[in-house]
């Protein structure tokens, strides 16, 4: 029997009807211990962002408004506006569908990278719960250029993030869409310098000590593909 396990289904477009069993991961539950937050895979991602703020734990503000479920978040290593979920993951709990047992992955074992993780390569693992390590003190992440550099508190930061998102993407509850699925190309410094010489207005960001991200949105606009 073929089966598909889905989260909230916000990134799914079906070409044809599925033949088999469709299972919605609806594992719920949010709990806290000191600065750790545990959330069931069936919770909505944005609900745990607001729940963290309600419990005076900080760090997830820049990930506000991302559609989808908690269980999907580490698979893609979701990120936005200078933050990624991998910045906060303590561990990911999974159920191995082939071996019939629970398996827990530490942050390092998740093999997180830019919009990637070990879970993309292991479809037999059903994510059941995640544990996030958050901060008891708010420190605004304002690396994204459009964000105000001075922020009063975490709720203002969240408000700013939601405002930016609303300008870039339609509300998926009113106009269904799969959001932004383009990855920013990662290139070497030498390639970036060549691009800057040809296109001085190009938008780029530091990725690590040797590589840079080029804005996919800028490239799409430049090629009139929007």
Where are the model-predicted features located?
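Phosphate/pyrophosphate- and phosphate-bearing ligand-binding catalytic cores of soluble enzymes
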Residues: 102-226
